[in-house]
UniProtKB/Swiss-Prot annotation:
Belongs to the class-II aminoacyl-tRNA synthetase family. Consists of three domains; the N-terminal catalytic domain, the editing domain and the C-terminal C-Ala domain. The editing domain removes incorrectly charged amino acids, while the C-Ala domain, along with tRNA(Ala), serves as a bridge to cooperatively bring together the editing and aminoacylation centers thus stimulating deacylation of misacylated tRNAs. GO terms for molecular function: alanine-tRNA ligase activity; aminoacyl-tRNA deacylase activity; ATP binding; tRNA binding; zinc ion binding. The lineage of its organism: Archaea, Methanobacteriati, Thermoplasmatota, Thermoplasmata, Thermoplasmatales. Keywords: Aminoacyl-tRNA synthetase, ATP-binding, Cytoplasm, Ligase, Metal-binding, Nucleotide-binding, Protein biosynthesis, RNA-binding, tRNA-binding, Zinc. It comes from Thermoplasma acidophilum (strain ATCC 25905 / DSM 1728 / JCM 9062 / NBRC 15155 / AMRC-C165). Its EC number is 6.1.1.7. This is Alanine--tRNA ligase. It catalyses: tRNA(Ala) + L-alanine + ATP = L-alanyl-tRNA(Ala) + AMP + diphosphate. One of its GO terms (biological process) is alanyl-tRNA aminoacylation. Catalyzes the attachment of alanine to tRNA(Ala) in a two-step reaction: alanine is first activated by ATP to form Ala-AMP and then transferred to the acceptor end of tRNA(Ala). Also edits incorrectly charged Ser-tRNA(Ala) and Gly-tRNA(Ala) via its editing domain. GO terms for cellular component: cytoplasm. Its cofactor is Zn(2+). It is found in: Cytoplasm.
Length: 871
């Protein structure tokens, strides 16, 4: 980052006895009240000196530390916000919340949406998977944690507070709130970047432990910007945002001084596991030294840690191996906590996106449970974690979690049973396995690298498993959907959206403000542009007595562009007519999609989320998350509930609400259909059934749908089901077509319609019986022909030969192998003779060579030769 001279030379530092120094080890600048300090406080420049020597007078539990932080800042005018889910439904570019600022990116940080409070304080559960391989090993790494924050959002017109107040608040909380000696605190200068924003930052350390980061976000990504961080250029933005992050778990650990962070935050669960497993005790003295050594080299290296321990403990290597089970205890509890947060957000394990990350944690936890001999279950650990955090995760779907885990455990056991067969197959194809093969085995089959390594050792083979193996795999799955920006060369003309003013408007008159070729932009339009899974409207414009058809309608920002099959000049008024039959069917299908989604949640469970949608004129499709097959009985139940609601005639309302007012009322279900970057959310609500942010056109009452019929339900990928349906007139046509087909069948069978299913079933059974009889007769015929076949060859090498059709080769081969008979089959293809040797004794190629003096095609079980001479 280009140096911004003095931007962190704050009055608070200068007036509070701080000195700015340069670390003698890493060269970073830092602020301290300790005249003797010459290192920045960060590891490896400083060691962990708080273990067994806490600088906090009182020992805090996790909940006590959270309460202390929140109350401290509430007293100082900060609005408390409840935590968001760990799955950011309000964003499409990331899979999990990694930090509290994710709650406000990009809608608040861009200035589009007003913050829900200013300033605010909260404790946000977060999940980071980049260090998953180090969990349990270093004593400090976690996959899930709570980020405490006190943030302010400053605009050009109003400054709430900025750098001076932020640092002052931090210092006061640590000293007055927790009782830490100010001389033990150091503030290290370091630039920060993330989520398209950046700014100067201070990292806060106490006795070697980083407890907070204070970010002063005032920059945005800009390829021409004057500032650079990690190869990305930035420029100043209009807003100045205080983005702080205090590690709740680390502050709790600091207050207790335990050997590891796990013992500070999971004391009761650890005790439970040790009482119910083969792990009897913890060598706390040695474990403390392991943790201290692990921070002295980045990235973590086991060999380095052992070498440091051997300076003090002659048997360090042996003791290091002995504590690995303890580390598995820490790992499975940590992973259970992350899973508790994921399941509370209704994540369904799968092979893609956030579901993949959940499955990875589940399988790592199962392996740790196996290694430690824990006699409980993963569900027990998740339940205990929820008990510890029920204040911040009040609603926990226990039955959903139990159902999902039972399915996942069976899949895991299946991998354990059949994994070696898959490994053997890969070895036979490739010989030596590589890192890419390890990743493939884990990614596609769920076989852990530890399992592969152990199995290869039994076969005298070796493979290196990198310490960051899971981080390598995660990089393939961690990115969310990055929205493709729509670029256009059109002028920025705001087109009034008549289809919102009156969705039932069929005709209108507008002024052409821009024309180029066969494209025009009007001052207003009733033509709906493509968006939200709803296709664009069709219709025509009347100009000079001619009809010019509209073939496409697209929206770029606030500009709506109409593509025509002719040309209309700029500056003229035109009369537009919507293809109303098409639009009305699209409106029926769009409203039906919302209705169906609400009913699916009601019938299948709250875990159902929209995963994709496409509306059309004749039928529409809705993709949902679900973990069990949807059977015919369930489909009938869904259709009947939809029909009941249609008969009730629920109203459909459309309102434009402020972001946070809408979220407070409806929750994050609002974003099932997408995330609008607008100051307000257009909420479409079907009374008591569904409420979503939606930009489509809708009916006024669901009674106008008339009828809905599910045409097909299919699993399009693991735990994603596609429901194809028709509503309104297309559904009526579907019923009519079905009746006509049924009537035709009943006429042919001379049976009433209500009896045709039974009649067809009987016919089908009779047909199946006939096929079996024919197959049996065919088999007996082939056996007789083999038994009575003449032989060809020379004495000692004679083989039966039979004539047959090429289509019979498969059946002949099965019979020959069952009877262990080597034979020749003669077939005729395009006037040529083909001779096929079938040999259960594995000498088919040799048979062709000896009998026909020819080079055969095929293998030792079946080989063939074609005589090029025609009959």
């Amino acid at each position: 980052m280009e140096k911004q001279t003095g931007e962190l030379d704050l009055e608070f530092f200068l007036n509070s006895g701080f000195e700015k120094k340069q670390c003698i080890k890493c060269g970073s600048y830092f602020w301290t009240q300790d005249k003797e300090r010459n290192t920045c406080g960060d590891t490896p420049c400083d060691e962990y000196t708080f273990i067994g020597n806490s600088p906090v007078p009182k020992s805090y539990s996790l909940s006590e530390m959270r309460d202390a932080f929140i109350k401290f800042f509430e007293k100082r005018g900060h609005k408390f916000l409840k935590p968001y889910p760990v799955v950011p439904r309000w964003r499409e570019d990331v899979l999990l919340v990694n930090a509290s600022i994710y709650d406000f990116q990009p809608h608040v940080t861009s200035g589009i949406v007003r913050p829900p409070g200013n300033p605010i304080v909260m404790s946000q559960p977060s999940i980071r998977m980049n260090d998953v391989d180090l969990v349990g090993i270093t004593g400090r790494h976690l996959t899930s944690f709570e980020m405490l924050c006190h943030d302010s959002f400053n605009t050009k017109d109003k400054t709430v507070y900025w750098k001076e107040e932020t640092v002052h608040y931090c210092y006061d909380f640590l000293t007055e709130g927790l009782g830490i000696d100010g001389k033990l605190i150091s503030f290290k200068e370091k630039p920060w970047s993330g989520g398209g924003n950046a700014g100067n930052a201070l990292e806060v350390f106490v006795r070697g432990l980083e407890v907070a980061t204070l970010v002063f976000m005032d920059m945005k990504e800009d390829p021409n910007g004057p500032y650079e961080i990690d190869g990305i250029r930035y420029s100043k933005m209009d807003m100045r945002i205080v983005d702080t992050g205090y590690g709740l778990e680390r502050l709790t650990w600091l207050s207790q001084g335990t050997p590891t962070v796990y013992q500070a935050i999971y004391p009761d669960i650890i005790q439970h596991v040790m009482k119910n497993s083969s792990v009897s005790d913890i060598d706390e003295e040695f474990l403390s030294e392991v943790v201290k050594a692990s921070v002295m080299k980045e990235p973590y290296e086991e060999s380095f840690v052992i070498s440091q321990l051997e300076k003090r403990y002659p048997d360090a290597r042996q003791r290091f191996e002995e504590i690995k089970k303890v580390r598995d205890v820490f790992l499975m509890i940590d992973h259970a906590r992350s899973l508790m947060h994921m399941f509370a957000a209704y994540v369904i394990p799968s092979n893609v996106k956030v579901g993949y990350l959940a499955r990875m944690l589940i399988r790592r936890a199962y392996r740790a449970i196996s290694n430690t001999g824990y006699r409980g279950s993963l569900m027990d650990l998740i339940r205990m974690n929820h008990e510890d955090l029920k204040d911040i995760v009040p609603d926990f779907p226990e039955q959903f979690v139990s159902d999902v885990l039972s399915i996942e455990e069976e899949k895991y056991r299946d991998v354990e049973r059949h994994g070696t067969q898959i490994i053997d197959k890969m070895i036979s194809n490739k010989g030596k396995l590589s890192l890419d093969d390890l990743v493939l085995l884990y990614d596609s089959h769920g076989i852990s690298p530890e399992t592969v390594k152990a199995y290869l050792e039994t076969k005298g083979m070796e493979i290196d498993v990198p310490d960051n193996f899971h981080a390598i795999v995660i990089k393939r799955h961690e990115k969310g959907e990055t929205e493709k920006k729509k670029y256009s060369d059109y002028p920025e003309i705001e087109t009034r959206t008549l289809y919102y003013d009156d969705p039932f408007m069929r005709e209108f008159t507008g002024l052409v403000l821009f024309s180029k070729g066969n494209e025009i932009i009007l001052d207003k339009t009733a033509f709906y542009p493509e968006g939200g899974g709803q296709p664009w409207d069709l219709g025509y414009f009347e100009y000079k007595g001619k009809r010019i058809n509209v073939v496409a309608v697209r929206k770029y920002g606030k500009t709506i562009v109409h593509t025509l099959d002719g040309e209309i000049p700029q500056g003229v008024r035109v009369h537009g007519v919507i293809d109303w039959e098409r639009r009305s069917r699209l409106m029926v299908h769009h409203t039906s999609t919302h209705l169906l989604l609400g009913v699916l949640r009601e019938v299948l469970g709250e875990h159902v989320w929209q995963n994709g949608v496409q509306k059309d004129v004749e039928e529409s499709r809705l993709d949902i998350t679900h973990y069990r097959k949807i059977d015919e009985e369930t489909i009938r139940k869904i259709e009947e509930r939809v029909f009941d609601l249609i008969r009730e005639g629920r109203e459909v309302s459309v309102r434009n609400l402020d972001w946070y007012s809408a979220i407070d009322k409806y929750g994050f279900r609002l974003f099932e259909g997408g995330v609008p970057l607008t100051p307000k959310i257009r909420v479409v609500e079907i009374q008591g059934v569904d409420a979503e942010g939606c930009g489509g056109t809708h009916l006024k009452n669901i009674s106008s749908i008339g009828v809905l019929k599910i045409r097909k339900v299919e699993a399009i990928q693991e735990n994603i089901y596609r429901i194809t349906f028709s509503a309104g007139v297309p559904a009526l046509h579907l019923f009519q077509e079905s009746y006509e087909a049924s009537y035709g069948i009943s006429t042919l069978l001379k049976k009433p319609i209500e009896e045709i299913a039974q009649s067809v079933s009987e016919l089908s059974k009779g047909y199946a019986d006939l096929r079996r009889s024919l197959a049996e007769a065919r088999r007996r015929d082939i056996e007789n022909r083999i038994a009575n076949a003449k032989k060809i060859g020379t004495p000692g090498a004679e083989y039966p030969i039979i004539e047959a059709d090429d289509a019979d080769i498969g059946e002949i081969s099965r019979i020959a192998h069952s009877r262990k008979v080597d034979l020749i089959v003669e077939t005729r293809i395009a006037g040529k003779f083909k001779y096929t040797a079938i040999s259960p004794s594995k000498k088919a190629r040799d048979m062709i060579r000896k009998l026909f003096n020819a080079d055969p095609e095929g293998n030792d079980s079946m080989a063939s030769y074609i005589n090029e001479y025609s009959e």
